[in-house]
Every structure is written in C-alpha cells, then in structure tokens.
Amino acid sequence: DDTNRALEALARAARSRVEATIIGVTGSVGKTGVKEAIFASLERASRGAAHRSTRSYNNHVGVPLSLARMPARSRFGIFEMGMNHAGEIAGLTTQVRPHVAVITTIAPAHIENLGSMDAIAAAKAEIFAGLEPGGTAVIPADSEHSAALERAARDVGARVVSFGRARSADVRLLDAIPSANGGSLVTCEFPEG
C-alpha cells in the first residue's frame, strides 16, 4: 500500500514537470500497436522529442515508472493504460492526465472480472476522467458501444473524434492493404473529404 502511494506520488510529480502533449491509449486489444504507431509518427515529427511507455508497462506499477522516465524536454508522451477490473484505468488516467485519450476497441477481454460488455466499455471510458481541459477523445465508431463512449467523453467536456469503417466515423477507413515490410497501406477519408 505504501509502495503504491509512493508510485502514484512519483507519477504525479513526473507528470507535473513536463509541458508535453500527452496521449493515453487503452482498449481491449491493440493498445501496444496503436501506442507504437503514434510514437513512430510523433518521434519523427518531433525529431526525437517523443516518449512512450516501455513495452506494455500499462498498470499501477508500469505507468508511474514510464512517467518518471519521460525526459523533461519531451514534446509528446504516449502512455498505454490497461486494466483487469473496473476502477483501474480511473487511477491511471489521473496520473497520466492526457490531452488526447484513445480507446482502440471494446472486446470481451476480462469479461470474467467485469461481467458484461457494457461494464467493459464503462471501465475503458474511465480514461476520459483524466483528460486535461479541452481534451480530445478518440473512439471506435464500429463498436456497438460507440454511443456510450461518446456520451462518457462529452460528459467531461471532451471533443470527440471517431474512427473506423462505419459511415458515421469522423476518420473513415476506406481500404487497408498489407505491405511487404509488415505494415499496411491505408486509405482514409477525413471530415474535410
């Protein structure tokens, strides 16, 4: 208990010493891949001034350590947040205090602990509670829980951006072609057309 409180204090102190734009990522699957893709883009754009959580350091120990390792000169920080039970992401997001909160997907991971898909969606939506004022929530438009996620984000005053194949998505995936290097060539439609 004292160790956990010390880690939380470390996380809060580490977060308060940086002026970086912070991105938090959660979801039932795809957290690490999305975190790494965001990092690769921002690392290149910022000429090395981006930081990310190491591996899958996404719990009550890993998140504080990842925050503590973030250089003060960082322009961007990307942090993965995972959970097994309701309430865990709420604790992590208040440490991370993201400007952008991303939910990759809602799937039956940890359903044995949460009991229903609705409960999983609610637990993932906890990430919005830590959003900085004026923050942005990025949600999966293809999820049957997208309306609930959008409500949760709007309840904290977040700007909402949805993504996916759904016609209603703000950023709509039109095509994805696997490439020889292991990536994919994607075609997306943005709000401007």
Provide a role label for each language-model segment.
Residues N4-A141, A147-V156:
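Phosphate-binding loop of NTP-binding sites
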Residues M117-A121, R151-G193:
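Adenine nucleotide phosphate-binding catalytic loops in nucleotide-utilizing enzymes
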